[in-house]
C-alpha cells in the first residue's frame, strides 16, 4: 500500500504492560483506536515508539503485530535506521521480510556526525541494497547533524528514496517541495507545522498529537481541502499549545500519560525516559483539557 492518501501518520507509542513488557494486546487496542480516530497511516518503532530501548525481538514482534492489526486498512512505515550503514541495510531487509510493511524510515546517522558527502553515500547505499522504499528522517535536534536541503534534493532523485520526514522548519519544507519530484513524499515531523506543511504542498504530518487529536487534525485537513481556510486555521491555532504540551517533558512520557488518562492503557516509559509523576500529569492534563 502506498502513502498517497495518507496525510496524517501517527508516530505510534509502543504499549507496555504493567510490568514494562511489550504488550501485543494493548497494541491491538491502540491501533484500532487510532484508525478509528483520524490516523491514515502508522509509523512504528520510531522515536516516539522508544525504539532505542526495544530489543530486536520486541521490534520484530511489534511490526508483525502492527501488520496483523492494521489488516490492510492503512500503510505502515517502520523505523529501521541507525548510525551504522551496513547494520541499517541488514535490519531493513529483515523488516522487509515481514509482508505488509510499506516503507522504512531511516534517520540521518547520529553521533558519528557525517558531513553531507557522507550522508549522501550512506543513504544511496541503504537505498541501493534495501528491499523496502526508504524515507529519510531529518531531525537535527536528536542526531546532532542537519541534512541540507540541497542534499535532500539530490537524494530525492534516487528511485528507492520516496520521501522525507523533516523537522527543520517550514522554510526548508517549502524549498524541498519546490525542488523534488512530484511524487516525493514530504512530511513534517513537527505537529505545530501540520497545516503549514500541507498548504506548502507537502504530503502532511507524521504526528504525535494525533494520538489524542487525530479527528481534529483530519477535520483540519478536510476543511483546508474544501476551501474553509478559516476553520482549518482555527483548529491549528487550538492544536498548537496542546502539541507543545505533549513535548513539555521528554517524549513519549506526556503522550503515554495522556493515552492512559483517556482510557487507552499503554503503560509507562523505559529508562532513561521516566514516566510523569502525579503532579506532572495533572499539569499536563490541564493544558490538554482532558
Swiss-Prot record:
User: Where does the record say this protein resides?
Assistant: Cytoplasm
Top enzyme category: lyase
Principal subcellular localization: cytoplasm
Where is the catalytic site?
137, 165
Query: A Gene Ontology biological process annotation?
Result: diaminopimelate biosynthetic process
Disulfide bond residue pairs: none
The name of this protein is 4-hydroxy-tetrahydrodipicolinate synthase
